[in-house]
């Protein structure tokens, strides 16, 4: 999830795309909420370590409060289940960051 090979270009391109998804989530929530439709997004942090250089994994873990990268197939499930469950009935227009706390220090 963290690798950028799917999104070629400079970091500004990545940031603009990310901001676009956040803005679209909020805009669609405002538009569709009156119809009872909730719109939220999940913003995953670094997931791996499959095929990632060990130095990258170690550096990422050192910069993350939870001390590790996200586990593929495990750490996004809770966020998805929450947003799909009645527990999120009063949540819309939100981007749920699942990054082990990485973004709080950035």
Residue positions per predicted region:
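Short, small/polar-rich loop/turn modules that mediate ligand/substrate recognition or access, typified
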Residues: 33, 38, 91-93
